[in-house]
Amino acid sequence: MAFYEHVVIARQDISPQQAEALNEQLKALLEENGGHIAKIEYWGLRNLTYRIKKNRKGHYSLLAIDAPAAAVKEMERQLLINEDVLRFMTIRVEELDLELSPVLARRDRERGERSERPRDDFAPAA
């Protein structure tokens, strides 16, 4: 089996739970066809660089996949049919990177920097 990284962009008007459900559908589809998803990352609702099908934002997800080519082809076929999916891209990689992706690592780092500020700097409103 080969290793793949797969990014899916779903429409902005679906809920985060529906985007997560889409990821679970992809996981079930790949496992039915002899594949395995090693990692699923939901990147959240992000701005698109340009409008796609009248959408300015999209729910991004990254999947690290270990599956045969036929399973990946079937997954892509199902994504083409799904109306909630704006775009997707699958690339073949030499090995799966199971660490946190740079997108999530940066977001966690930024959240960590914000929370380090001491709380006693705030003066009460007079």
Curated annotation (Swiss-Prot):
The annotated region (Disordered) lies at 107-126
Q: Single GO molecular-function term?
A: structural constituent of ribosome
- Protein name, please? Small ribosomal subunit protein bS6
Q: Which GO terms describe its biological process?
A: translation
A Pfam family found in this protein is Ribosomal_S6
Role description: Binds together with bS18 to 16S ribosomal RNA.
Q: Does the record's keyword annotation contain RNA-binding? A: yes
**What's the family?**
Belongs to the bacterial ribosomal protein bS6 family.
Cellular component, GO annotation: cytosolic small ribosomal subunit
CDD domains, alphabetized: bS6
Keyword check for rRNA-binding: yes
Q: Which UniProt keywords apply?
A: Ribonucleoprotein, Ribosomal protein, RNA-binding, rRNA-binding
> Origin, by domain of life?
Bacteria
Against SUPFAM superfamilies, the record matches this protein to:
Ribosomal protein S6 (SSF54995)
